[in-house]
Regions:
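Non-catalytic signal-transmission and effector/linker regions of two-component phosphorelay proteins
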Residues: 1-6, 118-128
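STAS-typified acidic loop motif
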Residues: 2-34, 47-49
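General small-molecule cofactor/ligand-binding pocket signal
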Residues: 6, 78, 100
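Structural signal for conserved beta-strand scaffold positions within catalytic alpha/beta enzyme cores
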Residues: 15, 99-101
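Short, flexible active-site-adjacent loop segments at beta-strand->alpha-helix junctions, enriched
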Residues: 18, 81, 103
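Residues that scaffold the ATP/ADP-binding catalytic core of kinase and kinase-like folds
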Residues: 23, 87, 109
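Amphipathic alpha-helical interaction surfaces in cytosolic regulatory modules
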Residues: 26-32, 36-97
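A charged, well-structured terminal subsegment
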Residues: 101-125
Length: 128
C-alpha cells in the first residue's frame, strides 16, 4: 500500500494514496502502524483518496483501531468518501470506530482522548 506519512509532534497522519483498499493492503498498513506507533502513539488515517474499500479491509481497520485502544493509544479515521462510509455502515462498524469528517476534528479527538487518559491515570493513582 502506498502511504503518505506525515509525522507531527504528538501523532502521525497516514494517508493511503490508493483509490481501492483490499484486505491484503491492510496487512501492509498494520505493519506500518506497528512500526510508527512505538514512537508516536496516536495515528490519524486520512482516507480522502480512498474511493472503494472491501469488507474485509474495513473489518481489519476496526481490529487495528481496537488494538490501538487496548494499548492506550489512539487511532482516528477521517475524510472517508461516501462509498467507503457505506461499507462501514453495512458492517455496523461506523458507530464503533472513531471516524471524523475532517483531519482537524481527528486531531481534536486525539487531544481529548489524551486528556481523558491523563485524568483516568490521575484518578487511578488516587485510588491506590
Amino acid at each position: 500500500m502506498e502511504l503518505k506519512i506525515d509525522t507531527k509532534e504528538k501523532f502521525t497522519v497516514l494517508t493511503p494514496e490508493e483509490s481501492f483498499i483490499s484486505a491484503n493492503m491492510t496487512e501492509d498498513f498494520e505493519s506500518i502502524c506497528g512500526n510508527a506507533s512505538y514512537k508516536i502513539p496516536h495515528i490519524v488515517v486520512n482516507m480522502k483518496m480512498v474511493e472503494i474499500i472491501d469488507e474485509q479491509a474495513a473489518e481489519k481497520f476496526s481490529q487495528i483501531q481496537k488494538q490501538f485502544y487496548a494499548k492506550n493509544k489512539s487511532m482516528v479515521i477521517c475524510e472517508i468518501q461516501k462509498e467507503v462510509e457505506k461499507v462501514f455502515v453495512k458492517l455496523e462498524l461506523i458507530d464503533l470506530m472513531n471516524i471524523t469528517p475532517t483531519e482537524s476534528e481527528a486531531w481534536d479527538i486525539l487531544q481529548m482522548e489524551e486528556i481523558e487518559r491523563e485524568l483516568l491515570n490521575d484518578f487511578d493513582a488516587e485510588d491506590k
